[in-house]
Design a protein with these regions (language model features):
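Phosphate-binding site of ATP-dependent enzymes
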Residues: 1-80, 106-108
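Residues at alpha-helix termini
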Residues: 10, 88, 129-130
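A generic structural-conservation signal
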Residues: 17, 95, 136-138
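Short Gly/Pro-enriched turn/cap motifs at secondary-structure boundaries
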Residues: 18-20, 86-90
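Gly/Ser/Thr-rich beta-alpha loop segments that engage phosphate groups in nucleotides
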Residues: 25, 92, 118-119
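Peripheral (often C-terminal) accessory segments that flank ATP-dependent C-N-forming ligase machineries
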Residues: 67-68, 73-76, 80, 88-96, ...
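C-terminal active-site "lid" helix and adjoining low-complexity regulatory extension at the edge
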Residues: 101, 106-149
Length: 149
């Protein structure tokens, strides 16, 4: 902890310290193409350590399972959590909620991305392809721009 705090204080005089929660890292994308928000299949992210810039943007550094290797009830729970985050924050067409699922099956909110990545290594396109077609999603988004609750 001491070395981590020294590293943090090298950037600023304030630091946010959070409890570490061990578990499965999940990314749940929510899309709204005019029919209300719906969650895409959750993406399970597996790395050899940290999910940092290198692990995100260099193919082969992370492994993705879509849908996540969870039972259906847990998948529905994390999808509902992501939709709740999306609607509570009043988000528009797209968001991606990152969660940690602990060993008891409780999803812990990490953050929400209101402009999720759309590159070949980004998680929303991976989830969209697993559900059907990324091209179909793009088409629906173009036909229904700037949807807000």
């Amino acid at each position: 902890l001491r070395s981590a705090m020294v590293a943090c204080f090298a950037y600023d005089e304030r630091a946010l310290i959070e409890r570490y929660i061990a578990g499965t890292e999940l990314a749940v994308s929510v899309v709204d193409t005019g029919e209300g928000p719906r969650a895409l299949p959750p993406v399970e992210v597996v790395t050899d350590g940290q999910y940092d810039f290198d692990a995100r943007y260099n193919p082969g550094r992370s492994e993705y399972f879509v849908p996540a290797r969870l039972d259906e009830a847990v998948i529905e729970k994390v999808k509902t959590t992501a939709i709740t985050v999306h609607t509570t924050l009043g988000l528009g067409n797209l968001s991606r909620t990152d969660l940690i699922l602990d060993d008891e099956g409780t999803p812990w909110f990490i953050d929400v991305n209101v402009i999720p990545g759309m590159t070949e290594t980004s998680l929303l396109p991976i989830a969209a392809e697993a559900e059907g077609s990324l091209d179909d999603l793009y088409d629906a988004l173009v036909r229904n721009p700037l949807v807000h609750p």
